Amino acid sequence: MTQQVKQALAAYDVVREKFGDAVSAFDSNETMPFFEVLDTDQWPDIALFMRDHPKLKFNYMACLSGVDYPQEEKLGIVCNLESVAALGHRVAVKVRCSRDGGSIPSVACVWHTANWHEREAYDMFGMLFSGHPDLRRILCPEDWEGFPLRKDYKVQETYHGIKVPY
């Protein structure tokens, strides 16, 4: 077990002790060790706990990526969190919601970097973030049809009378 995995597992244990079954089992089989938040409503509380707890200090959200799970009819996010200046460890946290009208609570008030990342996940996947301060498109025009990174996305033929070349 690498030092990175040991540190991530220790961080997971602190979160699991506080939140119990709201989080899944720890997994280190991917590039970055991760766990999943199973109780989506607790995501902001878990995020705040991870940022502020003295043994965790995850003070930096390096990335928040949207994911489409069409076979499960779910959308999700993967947040790469780091304790930059304090402890030097990192972990990924996954959160999923229903593909059809589900939402994930925003953590833009916990990590300011989440603001634009959540907007991008909304723009590309149609993922809703409840409580987001400014949830609107960030890359596509406001009147763009659909969400380009969903696996079932069909490119519109024209946009304002201009042929879309794909």
Swiss-Prot record:
Keywords (A to Z) from UniProt: Cell inner membrane, Cell membrane, Membrane, NAD, Quinone, Translocase, Transport
Membrane topology of the entry: Peripheral membrane protein
Record localization: Cell inner membrane
Gene3D superfamilies: NADH:ubiquinone oxidoreductase, 30kDa subunit
Organism: Chlorobium phaeobacteroides (strain DSM 266 / SMG 266 / 2430)
GO molecular function: NADH dehydrogenase (ubiquinone) activity; NADH:ubiquinone reductase (non-electrogenic) activity; quinone binding
Protein's name according to its UniProt entry: NADH-quinone oxidoreductase subunit C
Catalytic activity: a quinone + NADH + 5 H(+)(in) = a quinol + NAD(+) + 4 H(+)(out)
Catalytic EC class: translocase
Gene that produces this protein: nuoC
Predominant place of localization: membrane
Documented EC number(s): 7.1.1.-
